[in-house]
């Protein structure tokens, strides 16, 4: 069982044995979760540093936030723990450069909930993981799947190097958008993915529906689409039914539905939003509500007749 998983030791266990000072790169929710796991494992945090643009002499969790250059002046050598997701190439290259100079750990912490992904988790869910692996039709898909599991366990980005595609490659070779898309963007943020899509299609589309629950993000979204036709924005969370749900608003990309949320947000299903209209491409970034969002799109998905010419239709 699980012969496709090669990593057994978690990055947390490696960090327990780390002899160099350990510095967390980044702030926010990711850093808070990592520090919580550090406390559980008895791992000492030596300090916090951030990208230069975010350093303004302030403190985070009792640590003065430093620049990387300041840490490098003070420490002969140290280990770096990445505390955020890198979404653009320049930042990815910066992180890789840090990894060439220092020992780099990229731990996997959950977007929602408190459980950690480790080999014990894999053994507990071995039957499901085996089923997914053997359902994959080609060797590349199997390699991607196994490499991601190894990365999540080990926190070693070497597992991602040979399976990572550029955004342009993904759009051109996998998503393959055409000029007649009925696009649904769930978790539209500030319209960044809509912008990417329109760059590929040269601003050609039929309709775009964008759903974003965070009010600040929604304001940015509506500003971006204000002069564009046939783009409809909804300040809602994607769900299986139309109702009210507790919501934790953190702006940026980390807002999410949460049982302990202090505010309530109106939710909406894709089926009710579209009201029988078609969708050719659906993007979901719904922070743990994927199952409910899919339930709420069942009618819409049932209307998609996948034939050879339209095989590219789907959900990303």
What are these regions (language model features)?
Residues 1-45, 51-303, 307, 311:
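Phosphate/nucleotide-binding beta-alpha loop and adjacent structural elements of enzyme active sites
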């Amino acid at each position: 069982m699980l012969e496709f998983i090669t990593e057994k030791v978690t990055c947390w266990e490696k960090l327990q044995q780390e002899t160099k000072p350990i510095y967390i790169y980044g702030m926010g929710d990711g850093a808070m979760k990592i520090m919580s796991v550090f406390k559980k494992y008895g791992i000492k945090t030596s300090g916090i540093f951030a990208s230069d643009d975010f350093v303004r002499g302030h403190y985070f969790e009792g640590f003065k936030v430093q620049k990387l250059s300041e840490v490098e002046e003070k420490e002969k050598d140290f280990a770096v723990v990445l505390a955020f997701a890198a979404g653009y190439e320049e930042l990815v290259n910066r992180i890789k450069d840090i990894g060439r100079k220092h020992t780099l750990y990229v731990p996997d912490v959950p977007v929602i909930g408190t459980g950690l992904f480790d080999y014990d988790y894999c053994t507990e869910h071995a039957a499901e993981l085996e089923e997914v692996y053997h359902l994959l039709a080609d060797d590349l898909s199997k390699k991607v799947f196994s490499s991601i599991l190894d990365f999540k366990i080990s926190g070693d980005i070497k597992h991602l190097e040979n399976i990572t595609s550029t955004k342009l490659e993904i759009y051109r070779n996998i998503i393959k958008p055409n000029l007649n898309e009925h696009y649904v963007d769930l978790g539209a943020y500030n319209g960044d993915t809509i912008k990417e899509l329109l760059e590929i299609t040269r601003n050609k589309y039929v309709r775009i529906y964008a759903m974003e629950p965070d009010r600040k993000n929604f304001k940015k979204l509506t500003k971006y689409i204000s002069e564009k036709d046939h783009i409809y924005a909804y300040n809602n969370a994607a769900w299986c039914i139309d109702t009210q749900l507790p919501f934790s608003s953190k702006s940026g990309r980390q807002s999410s539905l949460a049982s302990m949320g202090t505010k309530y947000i109106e939710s909406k299903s894709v089926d009710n939003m579209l009201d029988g209209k078609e969708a050719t491409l659906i993007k979901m970034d719904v922070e743990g509500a994927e199952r409910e969002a899919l339930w709420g799109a069942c009618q819409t998905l049932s209307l998609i007749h996948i034939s050879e010419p339209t095989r590219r239709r789907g959900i990303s």
